[in-house]
């Protein structure tokens, strides 16, 4: 009797229930714990993991984004790096407050009027964040993400003290200043917004054709405007210098309808000749163009809209009305007075708040500004030193930088954010900043001075700032937080060389831009070595997922049904890096089937012992050929991983495992592995065993970043250790050796395909013998003849040059022929 071969892996299917057991095991082993020791000799890679807003559960797109980040972290670990891949929440800002207001039915500005009320509102925010953050952590953990969970998020005293320290530094250097300027204002959120926080939506409205009167001769000048409610704030009319209709009007004066004030007329190239009548109303303020022209032309603004989005006393007959109602009312008055020529329905783009979608107004506010206009070129130069993956997204950053027209307003009339560490002396007006180091709450604590350092006024005259920072002022220093810039200079100097920023393309103009700006201002260095930009997660129809559309897909039922590895496989193959990716449940099923296939392969391989020593010591030429072909696949996967891509590696390793290893090599050496017929020597049999194990082990290691569960389960069963503590496989051959050997493997693959096709054409099962024909294959794979004959149950011989006369090709172009056997 021959040897008995029983699989060491008894279970016939991969059980996704094993994933939870592995999670507990990984936790017990501290498998993904970051090493923050500056003396660790390994080169450091820091992943500036996006701190998510815990303002709601992730949909499948968000979950896929974070699993891709984990895949890159796992790859770097395989390459021997000390990988710092933290996960902590972005627990600041307007989005959190909006969600809390909705959840608890409160209004922040009403609740926070007193110190006690503000404390209660902040407690609600913290309570809400704790719950949602816990759900997010459970989700990424269930997906097998090996992040190091840092419980100190952006609302922790540690993080906030760092944000405040950067403010103090920049204030003292003159890069932050306070000024009264026109700013974009959200009447609903009661706060200033930066340019990057503004979204636009299409809105249906009217364009109104309004009569002005030329003071010099009394004739009418018709002006088209979408903002007639701002007539009281009109300071000038402008026309294009090349517009012949208005030649000679520059320097003259028009009389504003209803309000009767004098308005000067100017030429300006910014006017669009083909819009309306070609005359543009410059008023305070309809849009950013108005703001720019008021400054350029030295016009005196008249404020018409208050912080509630209501017209003030300067608006005359429409005072006290909300903006939209005021627009309708002023149009009625103009029509009644014979001053409205006509109105036309239009659809135009309206700026809205990025969170609550309320239309924004431009009002005058005294705010704190960070200088950014002076740094536009420097930010571009810093970005030019970074490696963008993919390169096409670099232009989006540059285009945004070019579009910036004002310094960054960083102060917000909100509550759940990092407080601005500033006190104002009510006696002398001095602005006072404390020493950096600890976390300050100026609205709730005593000032850190006994008296005003400038005028000596007692402490009671030092008024603490009540505003907080724009949340991006916090988030933008995340690369400094994860590299320990403020606390461990030695670690920072080593870690800051290899910082990876993974993020979506939708926040290029915010998180990416602000981070580059802030790190440059604070350190003089580029913030990142690599910038990895992904597309947007879409539903199966290619639409963004929104509650309003009812198309948000919860990842948890998908994971429960198919497993974390299956979901991760979809996340890897959903789209090429940088492009939008649609959810496709069929690709999740493919991932589940792939995990099952790997398990079955491993179960087969586990039937045979793993011989000691190098697999090359025993390998036949056939074995070496497939090891060399695997080398090619793994080199290509390694290169793609190194480009921060997971799409190509996932497809390459899938092809290697399923189409090459399972479909061809395993089938080819199955007879040799069992050797029940005694056709092969013991050495040849053990060579097959060694190669089976080596190919499987290499596939497991290469696939482990993408499918960490099933690969680790198999590796622990067969090889006694975690796959996640292994190193990326070294090549087994020189490039020249590999090229020659891999070519032989490809030829063997083509022979298999041709013979199987031949059997099908003859109506035979693949396991049935070919006893009426002889198969002719090109020379060069003589060493594979016995394996091929055992697999196909066919007589096989090689030929050189032209195929023998009378033979027929098995598959066109295959170079594999067959000829009838001589009786």
From Swiss-Prot:
Record gene name: valS
UniProt catalytic activity: tRNA(Val) + L-valine + ATP = L-valyl-tRNA(Val) + AMP + diphosphate
EC code(s) of this entry: 6.1.1.9
Family: Belongs to the class-I aminoacyl-tRNA synthetase family. ValS type 2 subfamily.
MF (Gene Ontology): aminoacyl-tRNA deacylase activity; ATP binding; valine-tRNA ligase activity
GO (cellular component) term, any one: cytosol
Superkingdom of source: Archaea
Annotated keywords: Aminoacyl-tRNA synthetase, ATP-binding, Cytoplasm, Ligase, Nucleotide-binding, Protein biosynthesis
Its biological purpose: Catalyzes the attachment of valine to tRNA(Val). As ValRS can inadvertently accommodate and process structurally similar amino acids such as threonine, to avoid such errors, it has a 'posttransfer' editing activity that hydrolyzes mischarged Thr-tRNA(Val) in a tRNA-dependent manner.
Location of the protein in the cell: Cytoplasm
Alphabetized InterPro entries for the sequence: aa-tRNA-synth_Ia (IPR002300), Anticodon_Ia_Val (IPR033705), M/V/L/I-tRNA-synth_anticd-bd (IPR013155), Rossmann-like_a/b/a_fold (IPR014729), tRNAsynth_Ia_anticodon-bd (IPR009080), Val/Leu/Ile-tRNA-synth_edit (IPR009008), Valyl-tRNA_ligase (IPR002303)
Predominant cellular place of this UniProt entry's protein: cytoplasm
Pfam families: Anticodon_1, tRNA-synt_1
Name of this protein: Valine--tRNA ligase
């Amino acid at each position: 009797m021959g040897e008995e071969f029983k699989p060491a892996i008894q279970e016939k299917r991969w059980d996704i229930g094993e994933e939870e057991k592995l999670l507990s095991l990984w936790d017990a082993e501290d498998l993904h714990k970051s090493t923050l020791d500056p003396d660790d000799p390994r080169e450091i890679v820091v992943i500036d993991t996006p701190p998510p807003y815990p303002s709601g559960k992730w949909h499948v797109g968000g979950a896929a984004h974070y699993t891709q980040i984990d895949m890159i972290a796992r790859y770097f670990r395989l390459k021997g790096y000390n990988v710092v891949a933290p996960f902590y929440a972005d627990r600041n800002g307007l989005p959190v407050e909006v969600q809390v207001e909705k959840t608890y039915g409160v209004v922040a500005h009403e609740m926070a009027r007193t110190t006690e009320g503000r404390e209660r509102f902040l407690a609600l925010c913290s309570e809400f964040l704790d719950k949602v953050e816990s759900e997010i952590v459970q989700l990424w953990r269930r997906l097998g993400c090996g992040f190091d969970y840092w419980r100190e998020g952006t609302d922790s005293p540690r993080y906030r003290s760092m944000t405040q320290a950067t403010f103090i530094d920049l204030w003292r250097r003159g890069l932050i200043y306070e000024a009264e300027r026109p700013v974009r204002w959200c009447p609903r959120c009661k706060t200033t917004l930066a340019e990057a926080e503004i979204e636009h939506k299409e809105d249906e409205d009217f364009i109104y054709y309004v009569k002005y009167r030329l003071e010099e001769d009394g004739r009418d000048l018709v002006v088209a405007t979408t903002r007639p409610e701002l007539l009281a704030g009109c300071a000038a009319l402008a026309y294009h210098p090349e517009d012949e209709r208005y030649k000679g009007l520059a320097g003259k004066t028009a009389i504003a309808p209803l309000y009767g004030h004098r308005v000067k007329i100017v030429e300006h190239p910014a006017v669009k000749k083909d819009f309306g009548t070609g005359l543009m109303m410059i008023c305070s303020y309809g849009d950013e163009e108005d703001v720019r022209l008021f400054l350029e032309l030295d016009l005196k603004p008249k404020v018409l809209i208050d912080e509630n989005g209501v017209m003030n006393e300067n608006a005359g007959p429409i005072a006290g009305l909300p903006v939209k109602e005021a627009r309708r009312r002023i149009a009625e008055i103009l029509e009644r007075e014979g001053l409205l020529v006509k109105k036309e329905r239009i659809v135009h783009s309206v700026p809205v708040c990025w969170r609550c979608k309320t239309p924004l107004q431009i009002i005058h506010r005294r705010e704190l500004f960070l200088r950014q206009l002076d740094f536009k070129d420097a930010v571009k130069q810093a970005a030019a030193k970074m490696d963008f993956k993919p390169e096409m997204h670099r232009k989006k950053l540059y285009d945004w930088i070019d579009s910036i027209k004002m310094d960054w307003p960083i102060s917000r009339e909100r509550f759940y954010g990092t407080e601005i560490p500033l006190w104002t002396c009510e006696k002398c007006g001095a602005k006072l900043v404390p020493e950096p180091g600890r976390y300050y709450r100026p609205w709730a604590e005593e000032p850190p001075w006994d008296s005003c350092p400038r005028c000596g006024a007692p402490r009671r005259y030092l008024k603490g700032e009540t505003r907080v920072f724009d949340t991006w002022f916090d988030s933008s220093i995340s690369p400094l937080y994860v590299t320990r810039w403020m606390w461990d200079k030695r670690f920072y100097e080593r870690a800051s060389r290899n910082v990876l920023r993974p993020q979506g393309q939708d926040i290029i103009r915010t998180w990416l831009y602000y981070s580059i700006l802030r790190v440059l201002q604070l350190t003089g260095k580029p913030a990142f070595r690599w910038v990895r930009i992904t597309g947007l997660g879409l539903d199966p129809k290619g639409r963004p997922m929104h509650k309003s559309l009812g198309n948000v897909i919860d990842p948890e039922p998908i994971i429960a049904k198919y497993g974390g590895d299956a979901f991760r496989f979809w996340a890897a193959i959903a789209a090429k890096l940088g492009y939008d990716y649609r959810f496709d449940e069929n690709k999740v099923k493919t991932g589940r089937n792939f995990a099952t296939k790997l398990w079955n392969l491993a179960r087969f391989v586990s039937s045979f012992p793993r011989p000691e020593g190098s697999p090359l010591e025993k390998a036949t030429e056939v074995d070496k050929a497939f090891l060399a072909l695997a080398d090619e696949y793994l080199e290509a996967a390694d290169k793609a991983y190194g480009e921060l891509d997971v799409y190509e590696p996932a497809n390459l390793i899938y092809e290697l495992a399923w189409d090459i290893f399972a479909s061809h090599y395993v089938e080819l050496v199955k007879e040799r592995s069992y050797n029940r017929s005694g056709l092969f020597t013991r050495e040849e049999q053990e060579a097959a065993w060694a190669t089976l194990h080596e190919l499987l082990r290499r596939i497991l290691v290469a696939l482990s970043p993408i499918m960490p569960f099933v690969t680790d389960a198999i590796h622990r069963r067969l090889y006694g250790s975690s796959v996640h503590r292994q190193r990326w496989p070294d090549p087994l051959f020189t490039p020249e050796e590999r090229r020659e050997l891999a070519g032989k493997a490809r030829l063997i693959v083509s022979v298999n395909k041709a013979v199987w096709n031949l059997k099908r054409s003859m109506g035979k099962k693949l396991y049935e013998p070919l006893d009426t024909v002889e198969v002719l294959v090109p020379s060069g794979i003589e060493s594979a003849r016995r394996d091929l004959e055992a697999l196909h149950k066919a007589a096989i011989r090689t030929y050189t040059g032209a195929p023998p006369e009378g033979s027929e090709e098995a598959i066109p172009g295959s170079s594999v022929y067959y000829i009838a056997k001589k009786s």
